[in-house]
Structures are given as C-alpha cells and as structure tokens.
UniProtKB/Swiss-Prot annotation:
PANTHER family: C2H2-TYPE DOMAIN-CONTAINING PROTEIN (PTHR23234:SF8), ZNF44 PROTEIN (PTHR23234). GO terms for molecular function: DNA binding; zinc ion binding. This is Zinc finger protein 184. One of its GO terms (biological process) is regulation of DNA-templated transcription. The gene is Zfp184. It comes from the Eukaryota. May be involved in transcriptional regulation.
Amino acid sequence: MAGLSFADSASLHEGRPLLLPSSFRESVTFKDVVVNFTQEEWKHLDPIQRDLFRDVTLENYTHLVSIGLQVSKPDMISQLEQGTEPWTEDSCIPVGPLEDWKKRAGNSVSSLELDISEEHLFSETVVTNSKRDDGSLEKLQANQQMLPREVQITEKTAPTCESNLSVSSSFITQTEVALDQPSTKTRAKQNSHPVKKEKLCKCNECGKAFTYCSALIRHQRTHTGEKPYKCNECNKAFSRSENLINHQRIHTGDKPYKCDQCGKGFIEGPSLTQHQRIHTGEKPYKCDECGKAFSQRTHLVQHQRIHTGEKPYTCTECGKSFSQRGHFMEHQKIHTGEKPFKCEECEKTFTRSTHLTQHQKIHTGEKTYKCNECGKAFNGPSTFIRHHMIHTGEKPYECNECGKAFSQHSNLTQHQKTHTGEKPYDCAECGKAFSYWSSLAQHLKIHTGEKPYKCSDCGKAFSYCSSLTQHRRIHTREKPFECSECGKAFSYLSNLNQHQKTHTQEKAYECKECGKAFIRSSSLAKHERIHTGEKPYQCHECGKTFSYGSSLIQHKKIHTGERPYKCNECGRAFNQKIHLTQHKRIHTGAKPYACPKCGKTFRHCSSLAQHQKTHTEEKPYQCNKCEKTFSQNSRLTQHQRIHTGEKPYKCSECDKCFTGSVHLTEHRSTHTGEKPYNSECPQTFSQSTYLTQHQKIHSGEKLLGCEDCEKAFQCHSALTKHQRLHPAVAAVGTSLT
C-alpha cells in the first residue's frame, strides 16, 4: 500500500474525503470495524456503555467516509442517527471464527454479557504503512484523534450464537477479545500494546482535555449548544441519543424497568436503582462534614453546598443564585410565567411535573407514604419526611445568626430573611412585598378570589390546600398534634408550638413601643397595629377595614349569613366557633371565670374583665363628642353610633336597623320565636339579659336601690319606673353592696 502524503494527512485533518488506493478500499468495509449486538446482549449494556458505543460507531463511520472507504450508509448508522436501538436479530449475526477464542478461554457457557469500557472502546489505533516518509508519519500521528479507535470487548460469558467479532487488520491493526469471568475478575490480555491514557483531545473553548475523541465531541456540544437528536413527536432536541430514547418513552408510556418490590415502572435503569434504595434503605453516599447519608450521589452533592454555601446557578433576570439546578429552573419560570404541566381534572397548571403528580393525588385520594409510628398516610415523600421529624424531633438545619434549629432547609431559608429583612417578591396589584414566593402566591388569591380547594363534606372552598386540610379536621375532629408535657392535643402544629411555649414561658418577641412581649412573631405583628392604626384588611361589601384577616373573615359572615357552628342541644347556629363554645355554657351552667375580689363567676373571660372594672372603676375609653367614658372599647364604639346615627346591622326580615349586632340577634328571635335561654324553671327567654333578670327571682338578688326610699329592684328598668312615682325623680340608681 502506498504511503500517505502530507497533503493527504492534511485533508483528513480538515475533514475532506481522502481517496486511498482501490486495493485498500476493497479490503476494509464498515462491517470490518463494527460490533453487532442481539437484543438480549443490548439489554446488558448500561446507558453510559450504549452511548459510548453509539459515539464510537458514528465516529468510525465518519472517518471511513472521510478517507473514502465507505459510500453507502449502513442501516445501523441510520438507526443510530435516529436514536433507535441498533440491536439485530440472532439469525442476522454471522457465525465467525470464535473456536480459537473459546479454546484460549478454556470455558464454554451459555449467555453473553458484554462489558464495554471507555478505556477499551477508545484504545489507540495504529494504521500500518511500510513506506511512509517520516514527515507524513509525524503529521499523521499528531492527528490520531481524528482516526478510528480500536475496540476491546470483554466477554463475561460465551454466546449461544457465535458472533463474528474479528476485525480486518488492514484498517485496525489489533482488536482485543478477552474473557472475564464474574467470579475471578481477571482478564486475558492479548494486546501487546498497553492502553495509553494521555489526554490528547483538548477543547479550544475552555482548555479541558479528554483521553478520548468522542468525549471531547460530547463536551463541545455544551459550548455550541448542538442538539442533533430530535424527537418526532414534540420536536424537542437533545445532545445525546440516549437522552432522546429516554424522552421518547414519555410519549409512548414505555417503562421497561420494573421494581420487584412494588411493581412501579421507570423509564431509565438508574431511576429504578435509585428507587430500590427506598425499599432497602441503602444510603451509600455520606457527607464528610455532618455524617448525613443519601441514596443518590446528586443529593449528596446538593447537600454539601449547604456547608460550602456554593450557589453555582445564577438567574440572569434578577441575579438570584441557587445551589440546585432544579430550583434554578423552577425560579426562571417565575419570570417567564411558564406552567407546562396541566391537571386534566381541574385544569390547574404547574411549573414542575412533580408538583402535578402530587396535586393529582388530591383528586384520587392516594396516600402512598405511611408513617410506621402513628399510621398516618401522606401523598408525597417530602410531606412524609417532614411528618416523621415530629416523632424523631430532628432539626438538622441551624441558623448561624441566632442558633435556632429547623427540621427543613426551606424553613431555615425563610427564617434567615427575618434577620436580613429581605422581601424580594412584590405584588403587582397593591405593591405589598413578601419574603417568600409562596406567600406572594397566597396573597394574590385575595385579589383574584380564587378558591380551588373544595371540601367534599360541606362544599366550602379554600384558597390553599393547607387550609382545606385544616378545615377537614372540623368534620373528623382529628387532633394529631399532642403536647408531650401535659398530653393536650391540637388540630394544628402551629397551635401545639404556641401551646408548648406556655410551659417554657418563652416570650421572645417584644414590642418596641410599649415593651409587651409575645410568644409568636405573628402576635407581635398584630399587636403593633394597635400603635400604627394599620387596618390592611377591607371588606368589599361595605368598605369596613380591619387590623386582622381573621376579623375580616368573621365580619364577612354578617353579609353572607353563614353560621357553620351549630349547637347540638338547641340547634342554634353561630358564625364563630368561640361563640358556640360560650353558648354551650348556658346549657351546662359552666362559669369558669371567677372574680378574685368578690368571687363572682362568669361564662366568658370578657365578662370577667368587664366586671373587674367595677372594682377599679377603670373606664379608659372616652367619647370625643360628650366625653362619656366606658370600660370597654366595644361599648364606646356602640355609643358613638348615637351621635352619628349609624345603624349598620339590618334585619333581613323587616329591614329594621340596629346599632349593635347583639340588638339585631335579639330582634331576630321575635321573627323566629326562638327562646334559647332557659334556667331552673321551664320558662325560656329570647335574650340572655332577660334570663339574667329572671334568675334574680330565684336567687332573691336585688342590687338596684332607690335613693329616696331605699327600695331595691332586680333590674334597672324596674328602678326607673319606680323613681317616676317620687316627686323628685332621681336620674340614676345606686348599686347596693
């Protein structure tokens, strides 16, 4: 064979076809440098090995075309370019001279498992030539990364169908075929030339070097953005054929990798391997800093960034950085507004497929994750993990500023914003800023009125899924959160946390205006509105504003007439749970609040507080119009309506208006005939004040005395009527002690 000239070598390097003598072209074909696999053999290759095989085969074919050795495109090349699997039928694999190989191996077995390593697939190739001039040889050797590489195939077991794995030495001088038994892990090395591991392939963009040319080609796609593998269904493109094949299974629904434990299917083999660690509990990746172990290496890498503080993913829109690529991708959808994943049940859209999957479990009621401690089930793994920390008390995330620990990293991140005061999320409607995106999303529902979460028991709708979960506990009366100190149970974790502080008496949040301390930061924020006069919650019906959201919710029930809390004794309904609790004491006769001065007992804490002012004569609330003082702010508000003439409470039956809600409630009983207040005798009353007056008949109590004749009466109205009998009518009766 004639030697390659310097010009020929340059043509090869520049990618131009290199025409060789006909004797050389006839001696080497694509079949001489290709390895065929059956479907069974192909299954034994992992994704990295398959991808490696594709790159090597395509590269070899490209070089054959470049030097003029291949004209027509083989079917295998078309399959590889389209991203399909290139295995062939058993009958299509030619039977070749493997007898010598079997004799050398000294073993005969039944099934074939191919272990193709990158080291073997990319071992150096030497093109022999007896008459090359030294200059051409040096140039050709400098460009060896452009030439096909040798293929070394390690066979773990021999095939039932003998494959022709011999390669013509005219083009590739040496092909290693070695037997590797799984029990011995030793290979029969038949190549006299050791594998070279110099990193000769260097990227011109970033300088990174690679041992193998195909690895450099894959790497360069990160700079060029080249994605040659395109999906015919959705036109999405990929840089690697293996990624295209996995993606196409999304369209076909093919999940060939099944879990033996639970039957769950997966698109990729590595996903199955990771999933199986849930059943085995295997966590092979351990953090050197804190000793925490993980089932996936990617999770360890992400976790280690907590210690290093590394945030390699930066948003070009707002400059915010993230430690995880998934969080970065999710964040970018905030700017684009992209929500590609849609629920077919309620048409709600999501930025992530995992969020859609978890949301769909709301419709199906599926709860696959069960707690072994208490038996409670959850529809998502993250919710289950958070719940499990309640039992273990684990709080691995600690704030560097104040030392407070949290069970979730997201809670730590949110907490740290209390130190920095950062509020990066602004509402476009009202301009209000929030520390967290989730808080902004919840706030936006106030403007839109969106309530996608509906209770199946009573039909009530909620803006947030968590609110629906909490509401359902009214029907189920579930109280899953129990205090370890006193055994008291609560429906909500926040209530338990608040209650536990009563044991420790911890009041960490202090008001800068008056020095009053609070257990919760939210309580401090509400208290501060007393000083600022801020009332951010407005009723759309009447325009009235409130300091607290809960007050607005309660107020709205006046307009809607909603009364969800019903008394089982008399059927009377209330718009607030606390009113029902107070009402039940009428039936039970419970008066848990006692005055320490005189021992008088009351059903309500507010009644006790009002009564105690009779001992101190404290009346801190003064009317600006007539300077009359009151012991309660509500009494002052009601009194001021005398001056303004305001009567905001209207009867839906007769349109009569009243200054106070209590008066409206009492008036409604005239229409319904309802008399819910009863005492020792069978007599019932429509108003609690009538009952109080009546009970004095049984007790013989007469507290109001006439100044003229010292006659005593049980009620103020009776005293007023009596005083009209005297020539000089007194204005006010005095209280007897």
